[in-house]
Amino acid sequence: MDMKFLDVLLPMMFEGLKLTVLIAVVGIGIGFLIGSLCGYLLQSKYKVGKAIAEVYIWIIRATPLMVQALYGYFVIPKLVSVDISSTIVGIGVIALNSGAFISEIVKGALMGIDPGQKEAGASLGLTSSQTMLHLIIPPAFKSALPALFNQFITSVKDTALLSAIAVNEITHQAQAYAALSFKAIPTYTALAVFYLIILSILIIVQKQIERKMR
């Protein structure tokens, strides 16, 4: 097989990688904030907040990410009469999706904390917020870290679906090259290998984190 096509395709995919990482990092960052709030509400006594979090999670988990992207790109801008770039829509979709799954991670991490931590905080004269900040959140975050990193890996993979709304991430760049060069087989083979390498690196990093936390 003539490998000269990689001279053009690889730079395109690396250019797409920049946007993929940007969308995944910003999306998971916003998703972490959303997920942390919803995760707290899910195990709290605030019935209204808990209900809102449950409805949000239900909607996100019961609809495909690609459908959400299409709705966000083609429908929402018309409803609000504002132009929204595909990149912003992509970040929003990744944020909302990761937030829904992170909320369950956070809920599990908080519920896994020894109830005695709250009693310890009270005995030390700490307020509820101080107890949460100093005695509950640190161990909860530590226990949730492997699952959070796994969600980041999932978000990186999910960015490939954003090619449906013309986000110039890795997959969209490969699709553009395949359409122009008529080299579908080598192009998509290279794309698969490219993702395999990138995600394998992230999986190795995740395993290292898990090993250090044992």
Task: Report residues per predicted region.
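Transmembrane alpha-helices and adjacent helix-loop boundaries
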Residues: 1-214
